[in-house]
Amino acid sequence: MYHSYSHDLTNYLYNYFSSTTSWLVFIILSLDTINATFSNITFVDILMETGFTKNRSLDQTTCGIKFGFVN
């Protein structure tokens, strides 16, 4: 029965990269997305989204706290 070593190598490389590289890429993309998302979100936005306040007209200077990720 013919055995394909290139197929084994392909499987090995696929398993290796799918377990490490794709996770690294996923994490990097996630961090980039989080950074891009939160850098423009103020404290008021967080309160609005979480439902702690319904008052959109809160002063942006008093509640304009950045979420930590700053470009």
UniProtKB/Swiss-Prot annotation:
The keyword Membrane applies. It is found in: Membrane. It is a single-pass membrane protein. The chain crosses the membrane at residues 12-34. GO terms for cellular component: membrane. This is Uncharacterized protein C336.16. Keywords: Membrane, Transmembrane, Transmembrane helix. It comes from Schizosaccharomyces pombe (strain 972 / ATCC 24843).
